[in-house]
Structure formats: C-alpha cells, structure tokens
Amino acid sequence: MLKLVFAGTPDVAVPSLKAFATDPRFDVVGVITRPDAPTGRGRKLTPSPVKAKALELGLPVIDLKPRSPEFMEALNDLHADIAAVIAYGNILPKNVLDAVPMGWYNLHFSNLPKWRGAAPAQRAIWAGDPTTGADVFKVGEGLDDGPIVASLTIELTGRETSGELLDRLAEEGAPMYVDALAAVGEGTATFTAQPAECLEYAHKITVEDARISWTDEAGAIDRQIRACTPHPGAWTELFAEGPIADNDGSTAKSLTLHILAAQPADQSNPNTPADLKPGELKVGKKNVWVGTGSTPLELIQVKAQGKKAMRAADWARGARLSPAACVR
C-alpha cells in the first residue's frame, strides 16, 4: 500500500481526494490545503472544500504555508511515498518537491502542452476548442511541463460553462488519476515527454478580461460568457439617457450588469431583431436581445448590481428601460 499525501483546495479537487481515500492501494497519510479563509457577508473563517472533506473522512490536515519550517516538519513526519496535487493554489518549492521519494503528480484540466497555467478549462471554452481533456503529469520546477503519465480527451458540446466543464473533468479524471499513481508505485507507468508543438498558456482570467465588448461577434461573446461562468463572471455596463429603474424603485444612470447565461439569437425566430447595433437592447415579451458585431445575442439570465439573479426578460420588465438604453 502506497503512503500518499494529497494537496488541493477547491471543489474540483474533492473527487480525487475521495477516490484516493477509498482505494485500497493507497493510504492517505495527510491532506495539504490552504488555511481557512473568510467568506460571506459575515466574513466567517471557513475551511476549504478539501479540508472539509478530509475532516469528514478522518484524515489529518496540514494547512500551513508551504515555505514555512513548520510545514516541512509536518510533511516529513508523514513519511509519504508519493504525492498528488490538484488545484492547491500555492507553488511548491523545490525542497517540498524533493521531500517525497516518488515525486508529486498533478491532475491538470487540459491535454498538455495546450493550456498550461491557471485557467485551462476556461481558455478552452473561450477559444472554441472542439475537444479538451485532463492529464496526469509529474510536477517539476517548470510550469506544467513535466512528463505525462495518463491522459483522457473529451468532446465539448459548445454550450457548457467553465464550471460545468471543470466538474465533468474532475469526476472523469479522478479514477484515471488514482490508476496512474498506482502504476507509478508499481513501476509500470509510462512517462511521455510533452511535445514541443501546440504549446499555449492559460493565463488567469481577470475581472477586466470578463468585461464584454459588444463589437465582438455573437459567437465570441457567447464563448466569453460561458468561459467566465461562474468565475469571474462576464459583465457589462448598462447606460441610458434617463434614469434606470432598479426593480425596487431606486434609479441609477448606469449600473453593472452580470450576464450569467446567453446564447446566439435564433435567426429562424421571426421575433429576433435583425438590425441591432452593437450594445443596442431590444426587449420583447419573453426575450431580451443585444446587438453585437454580427448577429444579436439573446440574454437568458442576468444579475444587476446588488440584486439577485433572474431571468433576463423579468429583469428587463422591472427595470423599465428607456428606448435609449444600451450596454457597453
């Protein structure tokens, strides 16, 4: 039985933790995660999803900073043979990598070397990739450039959000991850160097990146919205010559509008407007459309600043938009 230390923080790491903890080939001797963080309006200190699951499973937890002497002491005391790391959120220094005899192995949510970096699933959707996947690779000092031990590829539907894609890859990748590290322990794993071609970097998507430019074509905006959902959330500014009602009776000359769901407008629908300028709004009985650099985009669900998420048509009726209202 291999002694394994697991490092991870968010929800996408939980399926892999569960898979290792319930596999008889492994003894999870410790779980490394980031410290409790303040969340919600009350800013209450809350454990990470991985820490919560580890405590539920009765596993020891290390939530210290990886460059501290206390962290190294705690890691060495585990006497782990091998380590799994997925979405931990901290860079592991060389002395930490060297402390585990068989090395550290990462489950990365792309087919490397495409989309190395922090946001592989998001970038795959934004780029309109027809396929993506998950790879298990050995961690080194470079950025996601180690040899690949296992890989899976899936087809994208063209309608998933990054949150949905990450959930799918986390679930489908977990059993592959476990089998790959078991093969490493047995000495039967095959290590394949990453090819030099197809290298692209998946830089983190910032809030400013998520702002929509309505002069882009509808398909590109649709991909941007899905890539930014749920985080950091695609958004735009709503403007009008007169004040905009904000559903509760208050008014503002402009407000931030988050676009939670949208789709390219159905061109076969006779109600779909054909000549909207970029950023121009058209409100129907059951639909809200926005002009783009190509064909209109239909808004499905939105969230105005300080308000709850709601159907776009319901929001538009309550907002009582002036004919001059637009987004930009």
Swiss-Prot record:
One of its GO terms (cellular component) is cytosol. InterPro entries: Fmt, Formyl_trans_C, Formyl_trans_C_sf, Formyl_transf_N, Formyl_transf_N_sf, Formyl_transferase-like_C_sf, Met-tRNA-FMT_C, Met-tRNA-FMT_N. (6S)-5,6,7,8-tetrahydrofolate binds at S110, N111, L112, P113. It holds the Pfam family Formyl_trans_N. It is an enzyme of class 2 (transferase). Keywords: Protein biosynthesis, Transferase. It catalyses: L-methionyl-tRNA(fMet) + (6R)-10-formyltetrahydrofolate = N-formyl-L-methionyl-tRNA(fMet) + (6S)-5,6,7,8-tetrahydrofolate + H(+). GO terms for molecular function: methionyl-tRNA formyltransferase activity. SUPFAM superfamilies: FMT C-terminal domain-like, Formyltransferase. CDD domains: FMT_core_Met-tRNA-FMT_N (cd08646), Met_tRNA_FMT_C (cd08704). Its EC number is 2.1.2.9. HAMAP family: Formyl_trans. Attaches a formyl group to the free amino group of methionyl-tRNA(fMet). The formyl group appears to play a dual role in the initiator identity of N-formylmethionyl-tRNA by promoting its recognition by IF2 and preventing the misappropriation of this tRNA by the elongation apparatus. Belongs to the Fmt family. NCBIfam families: fmt (TIGR00460). This is Methionyl-tRNA formyltransferase. It comes from Bifidobacterium longum subsp. infantis (strain ATCC 15697 / DSM 20088 / JCM 1222 / NCTC 11817 / S12). The gene is fmt.
